[in-house]
């Protein structure tokens, strides 16, 4: 039986698209702002 190779790494996901990373840059802040405006339940990962 072969292993499932795609698991998704939570640490990497946070480092790439977490809230704190988004707040670092101007465009990231824009992402947060637009998601808040749209009423997303999850603003960042």
Curated annotation (Swiss-Prot):
Where do the record's region annotations for Disordered lie?
A: 1-45
Q: Which UniProt keywords apply?
A: Ribonucleoprotein, Ribosomal protein
Provide the GO MF annotations for this entry.
structural constituent of ribosome
Gene3D superfamilies, from UniProt? 1.10.287.3980
Q: Where along the chain is composition biased (Basic residues)?
A: 10-45
On whether Repressor is a keyword of this UniProt record, the answer is no
Gene Ontology biological process: translation
Cross-referenced InterPro entries: Ribosomal_bL34 (IPR000271), Ribosomal_bL34_CS (IPR020939)
Q: Which GO terms describe its cellular component?
A: ribonucleoprotein complex; ribosome
Output the superkingdom of the source species.
Answer: Bacteria
**What family does the database annotate?**
Belongs to the bacterial ribosomal protein bL34 family.
Listed name of the protein: Large ribosomal subunit protein bL34
Q: What is the lineage of its organism?
A: Bacteria, Bacillati, Cyanobacteriota, Cyanophyceae, Synechococcales
Q: Which gene encodes it?
A: rpmH
């Amino acid at each position: 039986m072969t292993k499932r190779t795609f698991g998704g790494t939570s640490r990497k996901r946070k480092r790439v698209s977490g809230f704190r990373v988004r707040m670092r840059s101007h465009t990231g802040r824009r992402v947060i702002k637009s998601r808040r405006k749209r009423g997303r339940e999850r603003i960042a990962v």
